[in-house]
């Protein structure tokens, strides 16, 4: 009976450990899939906001206090064959939305810039058909 109890205890511990590893794996891969900001906006720009674009990538909004400009770049999680990508960036206090980048890209779209010191910005777009949209953010 002692051997049976010991075998059951080992099986329970092994099963719990395997279940814990399996439960942790999806979270670990989801975190690992988020791509880091690539510095495409240039020196002096710091990330002030970001949003995941489904499982396709991440859009990063950056700001330079020296220039008063915001910059937007969308980066794919996995670079590869070109896919359609479009990003827009505008001041929230205007109806003019002519600052954009659009094309088929292997790794990222942008950077695009708008002078927005003292006002909010709107930024939106898509990566391979998956849309993101942020309105009236990062005011100031």
Regions found by a protein language model. Name each.
Residues 1-46:
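N-terminal prepro-regions of secreted/extracellular proteins
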Residues 29-140:
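Post-signal peptide N-terminal regions of Sec-secreted extracellular proteins
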